[in-house]
Amino acid sequence: MITLHYLNNSRSQRILWLLEELGLEYRVQHHERDKETQLAPESLKKVHPLGKAPAITDGDLTLAESGAIVDYLAQTYGREALLPAADSPAWWDYVYWLHYAEGSLMPPLLMRYVFDRVKAAPVPFFVRPLVNRIVAEVDKAFLRQQIKSHLDFVEDHLSCHDWLVDGRFGAADIQLSFPLEAALSRTGMGGQYPRIRDYVAQLQARPAYLRALKAGGPYAYGPAVTPP
């Protein structure tokens, strides 16, 4: 049976969702972030040397990195359901979006999150104006433009396509879900992207997504309505 090592409010949620989409038997091993630092606990280092989540074990295989896990599960258990044919042009569209989600879209979003935490961190009162100014300048000069460029790109693609690849829901949509959920929740830019909002709502309405919410517990980036 597959074991998912699940960290709250993380990329782990999309792996749980994928397991539900595939109808696989699995068990969830929960790991909780440190409430002060928001970092993963030491318990995850017993699973993988880097102590990161998500990670899965499937028989003798232990695998980390959500993109690798999505690809492994889809190719091993759901090729026809969630992947385009390997000899079709759509295959490379899948590969592109699989890597784009974490390689291009997620880094500026993560940087924005880090700077938000820096801005909120306790510092001496006389340092606060300087910290706020530095964060604001980095956001204005770099992060906001980077995030906007990526969200413009995704919005344009989704304006012409119901799903990312091959005209149907698939593994690429699951992989892209987390950065889009994070972008809508944290950037304050969601109002500019109606197609992204509709697309994410469409993902979050899937029965397997809702089952994953119940299995995983509270998820900061999920829909506002508690699943039945």
Feature-to-residue mapping (PLM):
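GST-like domain detector, emphasizing the conserved glutathione-binding G-site
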Residues: 1-134
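Short, hydrophobic secondary-structure boundary micro-motifs
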Residues: 80-85, 107-109, 162-167, 192, ...
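Flexible loop residues that form catalytic
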Residues: 61, 179, 217
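A short, terminal or domain-edge coil/loop segment
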Residues: 82-91, 114, 137-146, 213-228
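GST-like fold's C-terminal all-alpha helical module
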Residues: 101-205
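Positions that flank functional sites
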Residues: 33-34, 169, 218
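Long hydrophobic alpha-helical segments typical of transmembrane helices together
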Residues: 189-228
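Structured helix-beta-strand junction loops
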Residues: 50, 76, 160-161, 206
